[in-house]
Amino acid sequence: MKKADAPSSEPPELKALWESWLADLGWQPSEQQQQQLQQLYPLVMAGNRTQNLTRITDPIDFWEKHLWDSLRGLRLLGSWEAIQAQPWRGIDIGTGAGFPGIPAQIALPQTRFTLLDSTQRKIAFVQDILQRLSLTQARAVAQRAEIWGQDPQERGSYDIALARALASAEICAEYCLPLLKVGGRAILYRGHWTEAEAQTLEQALELLGGKLIHVEAFTTPRSRGVRHCLLLEKVAPTPPPYPRSPGTPKRQPLGQSNRP
């Protein structure tokens, strides 16, 4: 299958952004990684013509809000030098068009990512992208997170879990924690973050065997948008009832008075 080339008429500002990873993220991609990241924009835009993958179509916004944002969250796991060498199992829950999972797979080549989404058409698109970018260590799966988290082969088997633009933090925690090993970590990508949200999340984590380790606030490099990334750790086995049946986490988010 023919690989997509990077756009030949990129705006000058975008060309500068492609060279700014080290300053913005403390990360320097290899030539192959840079090429893979640059190929994502034309591939996603081509897919966007036939299905609703993203509303972000400006190339500079795409770099910041999909690529940079996806990679920025990984910094919570440790130094780039350390995490790039880890033979982890990772999962991106609710991957959509492949974010943050595809950029994460490019940046962490030793990790084997599962990109999970309940929509078959989106997973077919992601599978095509993985093939075009030769990301053979990753897989894309069409399944609900609630079902995947109760699968005996998947439950408790992942080192890291990512959830971005998916649902409220306590819902994301119910999707992520059952899939993690004890000691595994989840990164939840958020916009603004409030004390009320933190309290609700803490209540959910008590039920799920998790702990909120760190909340990191930052701004995006171009639009100066406010972002927060939450680092969770699984400190005890998740009780068998979680995740609850499909749809229940969203209908009845976990909280102090919400036990199975």
Curated annotation (Swiss-Prot):
Protein name stated in the entry: Ribosomal RNA small subunit methyltransferase G
GO MF terms held by the record: rRNA (guanine-N7-)-methyltransferase activity
Residue ranges with Pro residues bias: 237-246
Source species: Synechococcus sp. (strain JA-2-3B'a(2-13)) (Cyanobacteria bacterium Yellowstone B-Prime)
EC number: 2.1.1.-
UniProt binding sites for S-adenosyl-L-methionine: G94, F99, D117, S118, T119, A145, E146, R164
Cell location: Cytoplasm
InterPro entries: rRNA_ssu_MeTfrase_G (IPR003682), SAM-dependent_MTases_sf (IPR029063)
Family per similarity comment: Belongs to the methyltransferase superfamily. RNA methyltransferase RsmG family.
Keyword Transferase annotated: yes
GO CC list: cytosol
Family matches, as NCBIfam families: rsmG_gidB (TIGR00138)
Alphabetic keyword roster: Cytoplasm, Methyltransferase, rRNA processing, S-adenosyl-L-methionine, Transferase
Role: Specifically methylates the N7 position of a guanine in 16S rRNA.
Span list, region Disordered: 236-260
Gene name for this UniProt entry: rsmG
